[in-house]
Amino acid sequence: MTTPIRFELIKTCRQTGARLGILHTPHGSFETPMFMPVGTLATVKTLSPEELKEMGAGVILSNTYHLWLRPGHDIVEEAGGLHAFMNWDRGILTDSGGFQVFSLSEFRRIEEEGVYFRNHLNGDKLFLSPEKAVEIQNALGADIIMAFDECPPYPATYEYMKQSIERTSRWAERCLKAHRRPNEQGLFGIVQGGEYEELRRQSARDLVSLDFPGYAVGGLSVGEPKEVMNRVLEFTTPLLPADKPRYLMGVGSPDSLIDGAIRGIDMFDCVLPTRIGRNGTVMTSEGRVVIKNAQYARDFSPLDPNCDCYTCRNYTRAYIRHLIKCDETFGIRLTSYHNVYFLIKLMEQVRQAIREDRLADFREEFFECYGFNKPNAKNF
């Protein structure tokens, strides 16, 4: 059987061990480490596919749970799959819906068969199983699909986490058996286990034995301190095959992207750039800027003097502040564009630093300019 997803390792950074690679998908090949913008409902909020392409986005994310509810996976399938439905001819990854089931629904009951929960839109009772999650993702037609896993809260006890990862491993095997399009879609397994090294080892061992074409590290960026996330990555990524892509789910702050790459991660995704953009917060080479603040009312400089994105080439902080203060959609478009561009370009810089065997030096320079080295530094 030919796998639709292939990872090609190009170089390892001598200074850090970070990996430069190429992710080959049915819709193109893309350099890693990469940041994947999130388009929950088959759109990256306020941005067009053409804009994402001009930024250099390669793979984008869509959400199985949300698309199952609206418009329905049957409608997307009828349209010719997600690529045709949203006019995107590059890579797409869909998550399994597990995270939303565990985070959005107040009522839920976990059983061996699957999860019973309430629709967060109207309160209807719903059921999602490994088989159903894969069926929906087969219909959506993304290049990379994810196994259905349990997403335990942080913190969780060792006993609970052990039961959880063992269930997730059984569910992963059921996902593989249910997968109807293995020659067109790569199904990734998700390693869980919280902060417990022994459980991460057990989870990784179970999943690697099933020989997925790629692996995600799940259960991080759920409220734990950054030091815990980095420590977990340090003992988890070496457990995963070197010839398969490694995906850190739900992580998008600049410091975590760099620290994740240093610990062997190839793929990242997060709603962060568009979510904070809608609130008027932007990431710049000199740190975060809350554009609504009064100090920018007469600031006629670009958001980031070192950025060449469409927003920074054409508009000032004062103008963007005015738009955001007046709830103008164009303001949100401009901040979202800049933030997504910023993270895509950051990963270009990370890849170049790996080529030059100087990623640790780059990290130190970036952290110093951004302000991550200051006491009580913000997360983004």
Curated annotation (Swiss-Prot):
InterPro entries: ArchSynthase1/Queuine_TRR, TGT, TGT-like_sf, tRNA_ribo_trans-like
GO cellular-component term (any): cytosol
Keywords: Glycosyltransferase, Metal-binding, Queuosine biosynthesis, Transferase, tRNA processing, Zinc
Region: RNA binding, residue numbers: 250-256, 274-278
Residues the record marks as active site: D95 (proton acceptor), D269 (nucleophile)
Class of the enzyme per the UniProt entry, highest EC level: transferase
Domain of life (superkingdom): Bacteria
Entry EC number(s): 2.4.2.29
Catalytic activity: 7-aminomethyl-7-carbaguanine + guanosine(34) in tRNA = 7-aminomethyl-7-carbaguanosine(34) in tRNA + guanine
Pathway: tRNA modification; tRNA-queuosine biosynthesis
Cofactor(s) required, per the database record: Zn(2+)
Subunit annotation: Homodimer. Within each dimer, one monomer is responsible for RNA recognition and catalysis, while the other monomer binds to the replacement base PreQ1.
Cited PANTHER family: QUEUINE TRNA-RIBOSYLTRANSFERASE
Function, as annotated: Catalyzes the base-exchange of a guanine (G) residue with the queuine precursor 7-aminomethyl-7-deazaguanine (PreQ1) at position 34 (anticodon wobble position) in tRNAs with GU(N) anticodons (tRNA-Asp, -Asn, -His and -Tyr). Catalysis occurs through a double-displacement mechanism. The nucleophile active site attacks the C1' of nucleotide 34 to detach the guanine base from the RNA, forming a covalent enzyme-RNA intermediate. The proton acceptor active site deprotonates the incoming PreQ1, allowing a nucleophilic attack on the C1' of the ribose to form the product.
Family: Belongs to the queuine tRNA-ribosyltransferase family.
Record's protein name: Queuine tRNA-ribosyltransferase
Originating organism: Geobacillus kaustophilus (strain HTA426)
Name of the gene encoding the protein in the UniProt record: tgt
